[in-house]
């Protein structure tokens, strides 16, 4: 092989190894939904793709039938925040798996983890019920049942309102039983269930009726109530003591005023008996 060709080949191989090493050094982007990934039909969701500062271009991709399709791209300058993508008018075509990818120079780097978005409202709603009262103590158990009398769903999912990830409670039974427990205070919240089919796992039914679970720590509440009672009694005692002190002060002030009046004004008989004073038609009272 010609020396020039050998040198050129070495440069190409070294450059390729350097690029691969650089790609391995950069972290993969992070994808997240700013709200719940369970989105009603025609609703919207905001997706954020976090990448390193050196990334000048971020792409959002949807995976359909093992094929990547670009949903959008954002240019980012050095000091700008991570780009956000808004998915409007959610429907069956936009539900599915999403990933982010960023670029540095002319090179593409690896994809982020997968974010799954679900659209609801495509089938009739199921019914959610409980096997006991909805107020529980920590450590107790409860079972929620999701069923549909007219639609033969393959699977059901139980979702808690406010969660920013897909429901972890899934069942292939019909009706589906979801056991919660032993519960703690974090289990409190509003729950709904959904039905869906295995062939289209990102297309869900309307949400069921809502059930609100309340986990209460009665021991802590009793302790708090007792403290409130003690504080109220102490407050009443303090008010009573203040009232007694104020009354005593008023009584003492009135007595001092009467004593001062007796000293300052001599009696009528004492005035008549002073030497050199005579009063007409005055009975003799001086002795």
Curated annotation (Swiss-Prot):
Binds to the Fc region of immunoglobulins alpha. Mediates several functions including cytokine production. Residues 247-287 are cytoplasmic. Associates with the Fc epsilon RI gamma 2 receptor inducing tyrosine phosphorylation of gamma 2. The lineage of its organism: Eukaryota, Metazoa, Chordata, Craniata, Vertebrata. Glycans are attached at residues 65, 79, 141, 177, 186. Residues 1-21 form the signal peptide. Disulfide bonds join 49-100, 146-193. Residues 42-107, 139-200 form the Ig-like C2-type domain. It holds the Pfam family ig. InterPro entries: Ig-like_dom_sf, Ig-like_fold, Ig-like_Receptors_ImmuneReg, Ig_sub, Immunoglobulin_dom. Isoform A.1, isoform A.2 and isoform A.3 are differentially expressed between blood and mucosal myeloid cells. Isoform A.1, isoform A.2 and isoform A.3 are expressed in monocytes. Isoform A.1 and isoform A.2 are expressed in alveolar macrophages; however only one isoform is expressed at alveolar macrophages surfaces. Coiled coil: none annotated. The chain crosses the membrane at residues 228-246. GO terms for biological process: cellular response to granulocyte macrophage colony-stimulating factor stimulus; cellular response to interferon-alpha; cellular response to interleukin-6; cellular response to lipopolysaccharide; cellular response to tumor necrosis factor; cellular response to type II interferon; Fc receptor signaling pathway; immune response. Keywords: Cell membrane, Disulfide bond, Glycoprotein, IgA-binding protein, Immunoglobulin domain, Membrane, Receptor, Repeat, Secreted, Signal, Transmembrane, Transmembrane helix. GO terms for cellular component: extracellular region; ficolin-1-rich granule membrane; plasma membrane; specific granule membrane; tertiary granule membrane. This is Immunoglobulin alpha Fc receptor. Residues 22-227 are extracellular. GO terms for molecular function: IgA binding; IgA receptor activity. SUPFAM superfamilies: Immunoglobulin (SSF48726). The keyword Cell division does not apply. The keyword Lipid metabolism does not apply.
């Amino acid at each position: 092989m010609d020396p020039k060709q050998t040198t050129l080949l070495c440069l190409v191989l070294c450059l390729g190894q350097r690029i691969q090493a650089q790609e391995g050094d950069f972290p993969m982007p992070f994808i997240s939904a700013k709200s719940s990934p369970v989105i009603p039909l025609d609703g919207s969701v905001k997706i954020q793709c976090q990448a390193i500062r050196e990334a000048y271009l971020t792409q959002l991709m949807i995976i359909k039938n093992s094929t990547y399709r670009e949903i959008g791209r954002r240019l980012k300058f050095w000091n700008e925040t991570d780009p956000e993508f808004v998915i409007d008018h959610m429907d069956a075509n936009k539900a599915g798996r999403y990933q982010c990818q960023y670029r540095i120079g002319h090179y593409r780097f690896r994809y982020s983890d997968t974010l799954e978005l679900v659209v609801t409202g495509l089938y009739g709603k199921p019914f959610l019920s409980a096997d006991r009262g909805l107020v529980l103590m920590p450590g107790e158990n409860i079972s929620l049942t999701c069923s549909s009398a007219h639609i033969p769903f393959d699977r059901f999912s139980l979702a808690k309102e406010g969660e920013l990830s897909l429901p972890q409670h899934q069942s292939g039974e019909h009706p589906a039983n979801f056991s919660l427990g032993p519960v703690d205070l974090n289990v409190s919240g509003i729950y709904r269930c959904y039905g869906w089919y295995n062939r289209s796992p990102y297309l869900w039914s309307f949400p069921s009726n809502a059930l609100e679970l309340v986990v209460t720590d009665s021991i802590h509440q009793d302790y708090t109530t007792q403290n409130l009672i003690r504080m109220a009694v102490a407050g009443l005692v303090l008010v009573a003591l203040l009232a007694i002190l104020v009354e005593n002060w008023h009584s003492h002030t009135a007595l001092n005023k009467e004593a001062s009046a007796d000293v300052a004004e001599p009696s009528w008989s004492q005035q008549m008996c002073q030497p050199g004073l005579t009063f007409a038609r005055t009975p003799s009272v001086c002795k």
